[in-house]
From Swiss-Prot:
PROSITE patterns given in the database record: RHODANESE_3, THUMP
BP GO terms, sorted: thiamine biosynthetic process; thiamine diphosphate biosynthetic process; thiazole biosynthetic process; tRNA 4-thiouridine biosynthesis
Family classification: Belongs to the ThiI family.
Gene Ontology cellular component annotations, sorted alphabetically: cytosol
Pathway linked to the protein: Cofactor biosynthesis; thiamine diphosphate biosynthesis
Taxon lineage: Bacteria, Pseudomonadati, Pseudomonadota, Gammaproteobacteria, Enterobacterales
Gene: thiI
Protein name: tRNA sulfurtransferase
PANTHER family: TRNA SULFURTRANSFERASE
Catalytic site: 456 (cysteine persulfide intermediate)
EC number: 2.8.1.4
C-alpha cells in the first residue's frame, strides 16, 4: 500500500532551505510515529510530497489514521501506483478502479501531471472523462459540484489512482519551533491550548499544579498522555507534577480574600518559569481567555505576567467558551474536561477584577516563598511515555488478570465512539459499558457484590481508573488484559 502525504500550504511558501528543513523534520516525525505499526515501512521525501509505503495490509487503517493526526500534513492520498503506456491505458485502468463508484452518479475527472509527456493534464481529463461517460451508461459528466471526483496523478511513466483523500490537521511539524511548557489543569482550555501549540510545531511539555490530591493528578495525566499519544508521540516530552497544596494553604491563611486568585496565578507562573528554565524551555502556554474569569482581565493578566521574564503564550485569548468546547470535542478531550474538578475558582469568594500592583505586592510580602521553592524543588518529573509504567507501579494492589471467574463482569470504559466503532464481545462473561468519564459518578450504582474487570484498548486508562476507584474505597476492581 502507498500513501502520498501533501504538505501544509504554509510549508510550501517557505524559502528553499527552510522548506527542506521542515520536510526533513516531518519525514522523521512520520517514521517515529509509524515504526510501531510496520517495521518494514518506508518513508521517502520529495520536494512537494512525502511517500509512505508499507507491506502489512492489516495495518492500513491504523497507519492512515495515525497520518491524519501528525502536525504538518494537509491531507493524505491513498493511492494505487501502476505503470501506464498511453492515455487509453490510463482510461482503462481508471474504468476498472472507478466503475462501481460512478454507477448512477455525476462525475468529473481531475488530473495532476509531472514529467514530460506528449499530452497535457486537460487532454487526460477529457479523454478519460469521455471514455468513462461512454462506458458507464448511468453516469453523467458534471464539471461543477459533481457527486464523485475522479482524481488521477501522472508522474513520468507512473499512474496514481487515488482511492481516497483524508484530511490532516495541518500546521507545522513538531520540532520546527522551540519547546514550550503547558500549564495543564485537565479542563477544556488547557487541553485545547496545548493542542494548538503542538499543531504549530512546538514540542509541548506539561506542568501540572496539583491542588486536589492523587485523584486529580491521575485525571490530568490521562489528558496529557492522550494529547501526546494522539498528536505528539513523535517526540519525547516531560510531565512535571508540582504539589501546590502547601502553596494554596499558605495563600488561604495569609492573603486577603480578594487578591487570592491573582496571587495564586502569579505563584503558578513563578513556579512554571523555574521549571522552564531548568529544562531550557522558551515559553509557557496557558488556556486563559480574555474576561472568562476574574483573573483573566487585562489588568490582572498584566500583573500575572510581570512576575516572570518567560514568554507566556495564550492561544485562546480571544476565544469564547463555546468555541473552545467545540475544539475540545474535535480533538477528543471534551469527555476528560467535563469530569475534571476545577480548584482555582473556589479559593476566593469575592475576587478582584482589577488588581492593584502595590496591593498585590504588599499581600505577597506576607507569603513564605520558601514554600514555593520547596514544592518546585520536589516536583515530580517523568517521561510521559512512562506514565503507563508508573501507573502499574502505583496500582500494585490492583490485580491485573487475563481470565475471569463466575462473579466477574468486564467493564468497558472506552468512550462511546470507540465502543460503537469496535464493540467488545467476550464469550462466557457479561460485558457492561460505562465510559471512563462517568466512573466517578456512576460506578457506585453498579452491583458492588460483583468483581469489575476494567478494560480499555491499550490498558493505560484502565490502570489509571483502577487507581482512582481504589482511592475512592472501591476494592472490587481489577484490570483486565487478555
Amino acid at each position: 500500500m502507498k500513501f502520498i502525504i501533501k504538505l501544509f500550504p504554509e510549508i510550501t511558501i517557505k524559502s528553499q532551505s527552510v522548506r527542506l528543513r521542515f520536510i526533513k523534520i516531518l519525514t522523521g516525525n512520520i517514521r517515529n510515529v509509524l515504526k510501531h505499526y510496520d517495521e518494514t515501512l518506508a518513508v521517502v521525501r520529495h520536494w512537494d510530497n512525502i511517500e509512505v509505503r508499507a507491506k502489512d495490509e492489516n495495518q492500513r487503517l491504523a497507519i492512515r489514521d495515525a497520518l491524519t493526526r501528525i502536525p504538518g500534513i494537509h491531507h493524505i492520498l491513498e493511492v494505487e501506483d501502476v505503470p501506464f503506456t498511453d492515455m487509453h491505458d490510463i482510461f482503462e485502468k481508471a474504468l476498472v478502479q472507478y466503475r462501481d463508484q460512478l454507477e448512477g452518479k455525476t462525475f468529473c475527472v481531475r488530473v495532476k501531471r509531472r514529467g514530460k509527456h506528449d499530452f497535457s493534464s486537460i487532454d487526460v481529463e477529457r479523454y478519460v472523462g469521455g471514455g468513462l461517460n461512454q462506458h458507464i451508461e448511468s453516469a453523467r459528466v458534471k464539471l461543477t459540484n459533481p457527486e464523485v471526483t475522479v482524481h488521477l496523478e501522472v508522474e513520468d511513466d507512473r499512474l496514481l489512482l487515488i482511492k481516497g483523500r483524508y484530511e490532516g490537521i495541518g500546521g507545522f511539524p513538531i520540532g520546527t519551533q522551540e519547546d514550550v511548557l503547558s500549564l495543564i489543569s485537565g479542563g477544556f482550555d488547557s487541553g485545547v491550548s496545548s493542542y494548538m501549540l503542538m499543531r504549530r510545531g512546538c514540542r509541548v511539555h506539561y506542568c501540572f499544579f496539583n491542588l486536589g490530591g492523587a485523584a486529580h493528578e491521575i485525571g490530568v495525566r490521562q489528558v496529557a498522555h492522550y494529547l501526546w499519544n494522539r498528536f505528539g508521540s513523535s517526540h519525547r516530552v516531560r510531565f512535571v507534577a508540582i504539589n501546590f497544596e502547601p502553596v494554596v494553604g499558605e495563600i488561604l491563611e495569609k492573603i486577603d480574600d480578594g487578591q487570592m486568585g491573582v496571587i495564586l496565578k502569579r505563584m503558578m507562573v513563578r513556579a512554571a518559569s523555574k521549571v522552564a528554565e531548568r529544562y531550557g524551555v522558551q515559553a509557557l502556554v496557558t488556556g486563559e481567555a480574555l474576561g472568562q474569569v476574574s483573573s483573566q482581565t487585562l489588568t490582572n493578566l498584566r500583573l500575572i505576567d510581570n512576575v516572570s521574564d518567560t514568554l507566556i503564550l495564550r492561544p485562546l485569548i480571544s476565544y469564547d467558551k463555546e468555541h473552545i468546547i467545540n475544539l475540545a470535542r474535535q480533538i477528543g478531550t471534551e469527555d476528560f474536561a467535563r469530569t475534571m474538578p476545577e480548584y482555582c475558582g473556589v479559593i476566593s469568594k469575592s475576587p478582584t477584577v482589577k488588581a492593584v500592583k502595590s496591593k498585590i505586592e504588599a499581600e505577597e510580602e506576607k507569603f513564605d516563598f520558601s514554600i514555593l521553592d520547596k514544592v518546585v524543588e520536589e516536583a515530580n518529573n517523568v517521561d510521559i511515555r512512562e506514565i503507563a509504567l508508573q501507573t502499574e507501579q502505583e496500582v500494585v494492589e490492583v490485580e491485573t488478570v487475563n481470565g475471569f471467574g463466575p462473579n466477574d463482569v468486564i467493564l468497558d470504559i472506552r468512550s462511546i465512539d470507540e465502543q460503537e466503532d469496535k464493540p467488545l464481545k467476550v464469550e462466557g462473561i457479561d460485558v457492561v459499558s460505562l465510559p471512563f468519564y462517568k466512573l466517578s459518578t456512576k460506578f457506585g450504582d453498579l452491583d458492588q457484590n460483583r468483581t469489575w474487570l476494567l478494560w480499555c484498548e491499550r490498558g493505560v486508562m484502565s490502570r489509571l481508573q483502577a487507581l482512582y476507584l481504589r482511592e475512592q474505597g472501591f476494592n472490587n476492581v481489577k484490570v483486565y488484559r487478555p
